[in-house]
Each structure stands twice: as structure tokens, then as C-alpha cells.
Amino acid sequence: MDSLPKIWLQAWETLSTRAIEGLFNYVEPYKTYRPYLRVWRVAAVSNERGASTKTGGTTTPCTSLVDTKFGTMYDNVSNSAWCGLYDKGYPGQPGKTLNDLWTFVSEALPENATETANNGGCAVVCIMNVPVYKGLVNYYTGTKRTIGFVCASTGTTGSMTGYENVFVHEIGGHAIGHLADCYISS
């Protein structure tokens, strides 16, 4: 979880547990296949709580910078679900990258898990400690990496905007299930 000062470790414990339970206790096929999937939780302590904000565009500077472990950002435009990191740093942004996150997680995993992670056998999820309804998953075919970001939405548990549902949608649907969104407008 990014943007987690040390005093918030209990919040990370609660949010990560809610995410795992939301995926494996209520949603098929994950409920049935739970014994075949391994989950490791890795806490990362940040200097500040929150995430940097920006308005559209990969190279757009942030409108506010927050000093977090992974430098996560989110687009504060209401119709954008973008949140996370880029593959390289840009001026006016926190300067941290997807590779920084991947390296931190890889180094924290048990030895036997690192090979699986580096061969496309896992998805890394970064829970962003900001109360907004946003989530995103990126696939990187060249490196066989799948990295997802889920913000700690304050929507009602069990509702479409509830944190657990956003986690299930992004991680169960996109990161693990490799399903695409299908939106229809009238």
C-alpha cells in the first residue's frame, strides 16, 4: 500500500484483508480456486499520506506532490479512472516508476516466489491510500508484468463504488482474469 505513514499500518492491515476477502470469499471462480492461488502482502511505509494529483496526460506535471514510497498519482478529473505510475518519470511528477514498485515487491517476496513473479506468474497490486473511486491495471508483455492500482474508495461495502468491488473488478477481472471493460453509452 502506498502513502502509508507508520501510524497507519493497522489501516493497511484492514484494507488488504478486506481486498483479499472480497475476492476469495464472494466471487467465483476465485472462491473455488482459492487453494491454487498464493497471496503475499507487503507493507511499505511512506513519509506522507495520500497521493500526488494531476490532470490528464502522461507528461503533465502534478498539481500537488505527496511524498510516498512509490510516488503514486491519480488524475483528479472526475471522468477519469487513471491512477498509478508510469514506466518512466517526468518533470513535475514524483519521479518514481513502475519498475521501482516492482523491484520493491520482488525483493520482499520469498525466494521461490520471485522467479514466478519475474515469469509472468503473478499480479502486483498497489493499494493507494486515498479515498477516491479509481482503479487501473497495466499489462507489460515485454516484461510479463501485471501491475494494478486500487484507491481506497469510501463507497459502501457491497456497492459498485465500494472498495472491495473496485478491487475485485480491477484485480479479479483485469489482472487475473484478463477481461476487458465493455461500456455502452446510449
Residue ranges and their predicted role:
Residues 1-5, 23-185:
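Active-site-proximal segment of zinc-dependent metalloprotease catalytic domains
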Residues 1-4, 10-18:
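N-terminal module-boundary/linker segments of secreted carbohydrate-active enzymes
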